[in-house]
Amino acid sequence: MNLKNLLPAAASLLIISCNDNTKGVTTETTFKWPEGVAAPTTEKKPHEMVAHGDVRVDNYYWMNDFFKKGPDSTKVVDYLKAENAYVDTMMSAAKGFRKNLYDELKGRIKEKDESVPYKDNGYWYYTRVEEGKNYAVYCRKKETLDAPEEIIHNANQVGEGKPYYSVAGLEVSDNNEMVAIGEDEVSRRLYKLRFKNLKTGEYSPETISNTEGGSYAWAADNKTVFYIIKDLTTLLGFQVWRHEVGTDPKNDVKVYEEKDNRHYIGVGRTKSKKYVIITSELSEQQSEHRFLDASDPKGEFKVFHPRTMGLVYDIDHYNDKFYVRTNLDATNFRLMETPLDKTSKEYWKEVIPNRKDVYLAGFTLFKDHMVVSELKEGLMNLRVIDQKDKSEHYLQFDEPAYLSSVGVNADFNTTTLRFNYQSMVTPGSVYDYNMDTKTKELKKQNEVVGGYDKSDYVTERAFATSRDGKRVPVSIVYKKGTQKDGSHPLLLYAYGSYGSTSYATFNSNRLSLLNRGFVYVLAHIRGGQEMGREWYDDGKMMNKKNTFNDFIDCAEFLIREKYTSKGHVYAMGGSAGGLLMGAVTNMRPDLWNGVVAQVPYVDVITTMSDPGIPLTTGEYLEWGNPANKEEYFYMKSYSPYDNVEAKAYPNILITTGLHDSQVQYFEPAKWVAKMREMKTDKNIILFKTNMEAGHGGASGRFKALEDVALIYAFLFSLEGITS
């Protein structure tokens, strides 16, 4: 049984409050930055790098030294601490406001809450959070919700007092007696794997280190577990091992090793629990699956279909066949089926064809039904197919921008679909839908502390036209009464990489912006998959600049439509979206009054040239390989760090985590130092490093709000909003 979908209530049950006083927009800044405060500077040590006859000089390359424990390791920490102190000094006038914002954000969280239970293998599973606690308690009840509660794992007992704590995995054995738990206490995504006896509450004596969190699979014998070990240099999972609970991990057996370090691997069970699956994927360009009968854990995994460049597929088991979702002769994917003993592609038979305007995002199997998740123009639609008579229908939703998604549906033998729904004005909601009668029941809508009326807010959907004629969707939300006269500040957010779709979802924190007059806009730019697979392909590799152009063109569109005006436009993005921030800041520094770049990936050439840096090799087909001359110079033409120039830059807030395993701390650190050296303006650059966190930021539902309060205080200060 897979508990990784049992999100902590702190994350999955966002609730909000709203105050009646909508703040007006201040066009004349009343906030005053402290005067005479010198920004941190650091020494320059030229480091020359040569490729394809091109010489790059990195004066701040030495900042890589922290994890290398090199001679400059201490200097790195000193510099990061100096930057943190500078943030505190520059934001000192807003210290009280930040505290008020934190209290405001925290005040919207229902401190004692519980998720909607779902049933699997005779038990009802749910999470709950307790008042004043940071982490979730994972629970279950046998057969009926009136049964006594059993605590599977209390994350507060383990995580409280630790600088960082994260749980991933929580896989329960088929006999319901054991649970595998993955835990990270450093934020490097290196999870230690432990096993707990749910009958006695005792832990098995062994611990397995450096595993892939959430990628564990029990065999049907209730004692064998398959798990993934990560390479300590690249932090990529590369080996699958078989472990027998209660034995020394030194005796574990390696069942698979990925020889191509560009691939990501995973392990899991089919929904039917009949098979254990090992997956290997390469940047949405290639995939390969191996399967093993779960009742024969010591057997040999069989290759479903050999990896072929350009062929992507995923599988699930249903009765006497496998279903295969694939891009085989199908840009937007199609659904196929094949017999259990004939799994190579020549035996695949089409069930749902490819469609030019619809991306087949996924499918969920039931005894008598199949639910297909389909993405069309940025909106996810749920299509229900009756397996008996092949009749079909769609679930209907009436808001202009929303997210509908299949929820946790562990039970195979049911006519009930659990699905989730939310929009920019509708809090997260959980429904049960009868696939035969076509009726739905609201099981829970995230409670609104203090009362919330969605009619006080307006959500819209529009299309900006990019410079090459593409229609780019934008999802918009603002407080009712906001006039489209150009006077309001606007925060534009986007991601635009890896084919990751950005959805129009609800966020309680966002109300602090809307209630003070901000318009919030989500841009569905190329590099994501909102408009189909071609939308992704048109925003990666040698097409990456389309991502940046789309974002700029969306901002220009919103100005023309008078949602805002120049001087009141703010941009925000994180990780690969942080690269977007760096690129658009270089390309159009005049367009933004402020930019927020969270854990930004900004030193593209240097990172992609070092296969020892975590995740590099697995992303050659996303960004390019600098060993290729054409790709090298294209990446160099937009890499934020390489394109910092002597010119005016907007106000910028940059955040990172010292232990970030995905975008190393030194990328934003070097970027800040170089911009400070080169910029010709008097705007401020703030750089905040969480010395204990990684890529996901602080752990704990309250600690993370401190980061949000800092970002909002920064934006409000630039608008002259001080309360």
Regions picked out by a protein language model, each given a short descriptive name:
Residues L522-S723:
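Active-site-proximal cap/loop segments of hydrolase catalytic domains
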Residues V129, N327, Q422, Y493-S497, ...:
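Glycine-rich His-Gly loop
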Residues T144-D146, V186-R188, K199-E202, A219-N222, ...:
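Secondary-structure transition/capping motifs at alpha-helix termini
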Residues T326-L328, A361-E377, A464-P473, G499, ...:
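C-terminal substrate/ligand-recognition segments
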Residues A9, C18-T416, N420, M424-G428, ...:
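Beta-propeller folds
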Residues N156-L170, I181-R188, E202, Y433-T439, ...:
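Cap/lid segment of the alpha/beta-hydrolase catalytic domain
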Residues N2-A9:
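Sec-dependent signal peptide recognition
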